[in-house]
Each structure stands twice: as C-alpha cells, then as structure tokens.
Amino acid sequence: MPPRLRVSADCTSRIARRIAHRAYATGADPTLRTALFFPGHGVQRKGMLGPWLEAFPNTCKPFVEEMDSILGYKLSEIIEDGPISMLDKTQNAQPAIMATSVMILRVLEKEFGFDTDKRINVTLGHSLGEYAALVAAGYLDFPFALKIVRRRGEVMAECTRKAKEESGETFGMMALVCEPEQLDALTAAVNEWLEFNAEGTRDDSSSLPPIQQVTLANKNSKNQIVLSGSFKRIRELLTHIREFGGHDPRAVELKSRSAFHSPIMRPAFDYMKRVMTPEVVRWPGKMPTVSNVTGMPFDSADNLRKNLSRQAIDTVLWWDSIKYLHEQAGTKRWLGLGPGKVGRNLVSKEVGRSGAKGGGVWSISEPREVEETMRGLDETEAEARN
C-alpha cells in the first residue's frame, strides 16, 4: 500500500490561494464581500501620526521607528513638525501616506484583533495607494514597498523639475467634473483632442515631446476624470472642448504640482521595471488585489510586476475597479484606511454610503473612528450571515 501523502497546513493554504486566483483568471465569481482600500497622493497633512502615537503607542511607536530606520532619515519628524512644504515634496509625501495607511491596519490587527486574512476578501488602492494594498494582501513586504515608494517619489520629483526647467511651464493635475450622464461624451471629446485611438492607447500624440503632452490620468468616478500635464496645455484642451465640443465641465486644480500618470514620468516607470524583479513578489498573495491599470485583479506575478510599473505613466482606472467589484464581484462592504476622506468619497459616489443589507462604506483616518467602524463591520457581517 503506497504511503499516505502528508500535506502541511502551509501547503494547503498556498493551494487554496492558487485556486482563488485561478477562479479570477477564468471569470468565476468568488464573491468578494469585503474590500479594503487605500488613498493616493495629496491626502498628507502635518501631524497625522500624532493622534495614533498618542492613542496606540505600543503599536505605533515601534512602527514609526521601523519606518524611519528603513528610510534612513526621520520622516516621522517631517510628518509631525513640518514644514508642510517639506512634507508636500513627492519623495516625502508618498512614503508618509503609504506608511500611515499600513500603520492604521497594524493598529486594527494588534489592538483590536482584526484578522485581515479572514475578514477582507480583496484589496485595492488609488494610485499610490496600490502599494499599501499590495502590502496588505501579502504580495509585497512593507520594508521593500516603503523603500521603492520613497525612491520612486524622488525620481518623480526629478521628472517634474526637469520638465519645468526645459519648458518654463507649470505642471500638475486638473479634475474635470460634470453630470454623470455627460461623462462618456466628455471623455470622448478629451480623447479626441488627445489623439487617442479607439482602443484607448496613445497614437500620433506619442511622437510629441513628453512635456507637450496632456494625458487622461484618472477615471475617478461616474462624474469625474483627471488630466495630467502642463497647465498651459490643459487649459488649451479645456478651451477647445468648450468652444467646439459643447462641454463645460467644472475644472479643479489638484494639490499635486507634478504630472503623475503622464509621459514625463517615464523614468519612474523605468525605475520600477528595474526593481520589480521576480523574487520581490510573493505569489499568490493572501487575497486578490485590483490593478489600477486594468481595473481587474492581478492574475499572475508577471502581470503584477508589469502593471505596477506601468501605473506610473498609465491611466488609473479607479471607477472601473469600483464598478467591477460592486457590479460583478459582489462586494458589499468597503473599508478605507489612511489619511483623509477622498478615497471614501470616491467609493461612495458609486456604491452609496449604505443601502443593501450587510453593506456599507467606512473609512478610518483618525483613532476616534475605529470603534464605530468596527461595530459597523461586525453588524453588517452578522446581517449578511442571517
């Protein structure tokens, strides 16, 4: 009689994860009831660590010390003491936001017994937030993710500096807001001006120098898109679509003074391609993570490495990601962790703050929000079971 095959618990867990990822790749619906999401650039604020350090020193103090040690400088002092002009620098703001978001998750896990692996079914993050999402889902180690976010931020800052120096223009991002029923037509008018082809890829416009290009950086919600590039060129685009396209969207300059998700960030894309080697990605992760570039879950380690790199220059399909989870994957509960409420507001635009039994949208940016949020999750999970 052949010897009985012994399978370790760890091996069983890995097999289960592969099955889950295979279900995604084949279009099966594993019902991703609870999503964990993280914010992107622009939500940083001076002093955002302080309330957490005061409320949960046993968890947050070691975490902050680890953050500073990994980076090799006192980012915590910049976050707490400023000046805000120093915190707003891309190379400081991005690791600060990412680390603060992960720290809040660690507080839930260590102080409140929150079992991320059991209670969260899928993660996602808006732009920069994708790095925290990949850490939470187990694809990237926190120290590695923090280091590359810092270095990527340095490269992005240098891209912006060179573009300004070469052109004498100001670069950044601008949100266009319209009525939901007008968004498709507005996007089509923008794409026509940007010389996009029918598949949504850049054609003849790619022959322009990067500093002369404007790109569609984000599809954020049912009534908002974001443009990236020089403000001079963005205003030319707005004038064109208002005069000839019949559209008059509300235009809002974003806090960023860099043209993220545009061709001038090509060096950041090149940097990410170099550092995202096969050994840095743990595959499969603990749960699926939705890609900004495709609006669908990463389906392989190679896909993750490629699209996390491309995210620096490609459109962030945030609205597509939310629609996929809401309409196809069965997501009912949405938990946002990190500074600010921008992420929650964008999610709520699509799915509503509450509604279906067992559903809701919550976010935690301050310690006082933890207990109420945990109660809401507990109650809706109980509702879903009944």
Predicted regions and their residues:
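Conserved active-site and cofactor/substrate-binding residues in soluble primary-metabolism enzymes
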Residues: 47, 58, 62, 92, ...
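A short, flexible low-complexity segment enriched in Lys/Arg and Gly/Pro that occurs
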Residues: 11-22, 99-103, 311-318
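N-terminal mitochondrial targeting presequence
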Residues: 1-33
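Alpha/beta catalytic cores of group-transfer enzymes, especially the acyltransferase/condensing modules
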Residues: 42-43, 137-311
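FabD-like malonyl-/acyl-CoA
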Residues: 22-196, 333-386
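Acyltransferase
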Residues: 247-337, 341-348, 352-371, 379-386
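A generic secondary-structure signal
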Residues: 107-111, 240, 324, 328
